[in-house]
Design a protein with these regions (language model features):
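Bacterial Sec-dependent N-terminal signal peptides
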Residues: 1-22
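Short S/T/G/P-rich N-terminal loop/turn motif that feeds into the first structured element of a domain
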Residues: 19-253
Length: 253
């Protein structure tokens, strides 16, 4: 299978070494009966996000659909929306935009591309919150990432892990052991520190890992060092839950 990923979570490699990547991950639970229309709604927003990226307001946007078999068939969200920013300043600038700015910008993004009736329809659906039953947001500060190269592709499968740090050795294990272990085995891997979250977010998690496996990767070498490092590395963290997700829409720099 052809290696597929990653500039995807966002053309990270082109960023300045001094830039601190920030992502906002929104865990969305849909209102009953809206499932069939939701992805078309996000496609409308994809046009807006494409202009935002072109205008330098953000660096990436990804919509991941959650596999309903995740978390023993009881996933805590239906979709993940990931907005990527080159730094904290860029993120805060967007978060401070008033509603009127967004309404005007949506119209500008779709001018000459969509009928006025369609723009009005999706603008109203946005303002009236037609689709979201529940929305939980985490603000993440990138610690490290690893790319196996390639490009995003619809249907790409990724795994989203909520992590609790258990002791002071956790990040060292992630960066000095697990990251090295993933080389040649992951199309993408990232570890983030949760710097903020919405009031309704899950409190125990401190970090988030997102990864995309390489199905053609060689088997992990079984030896004493790897076994012991994995054993003790796992004592530094607790995985509170994992969502299997599929990429359905994206825009990136």
């Amino acid at each position: 299978m052809k290696k597929i990923f990653l500039q995807i979570l966002l053309a990270f490699i082109s960023f300045s070494l001094n830039a601190q990547i920030y992502t906002e991950v929104e865990e969305v639970t849909l209102k009953e009966g809206t499932e069939n229309d939701y992805e078309a709604f996000e496609s409308f927003w994809g046009v807006v996000k494409e202009k935002m990226i072109s205008d330098g307001y953000q660096d990436g946007w990804f919509i991941w659909k959650v596999d309903p078999t995740s978390f023993d068939g009881n996933p805590w969200a239906d979709y993940l929306i990931v907005n990527v920013y080159k730094d904290k300043s860029q993120m805060e600038s967007m978060n401070n935009k008033p509603q009127s700015w967004w309404v005007d910008y949506m119209k500008k993004a779709h001018k000459g591309k969509s009928k006025r009736s369609l723009i009005k329809k999706y603008t109203n659906e946005t303002l009236n919150n037609k689709y979201r039953e529940k929305s939980v947001t985490y603000t993440n500060q990138r610690i490290s990432d690893l790319s196996g190269g390639g490009n995003p592709s619809k249907g790409l499968v990724g795994y989203y892990h909520g992590i609790e740090q258990l002791n002071e050795d956790y990040i060292d294990f992630e960066l000095k052991f697990f990251r090295e272990l993933h080389k040649g085995r992951k199309l993408w891997w990232e570890v983030n520190k949760i710097s903020d979250r919405s009031d309704n977010a899950y409190k125990p998690v401190t970090h988030m890992i997102f990864e995309i496996n390489d199905e053609n990767a060689p088997s992990l070498e079984s030896n004493f060092t790897n076994e012991m490092m994995i054993k003790y590395g796992q004592t530094t963290r607790k995985i509170h839950g994992t969502l299997k997700t599929t990429l359905v829409n994206w825009r990136w720099q």
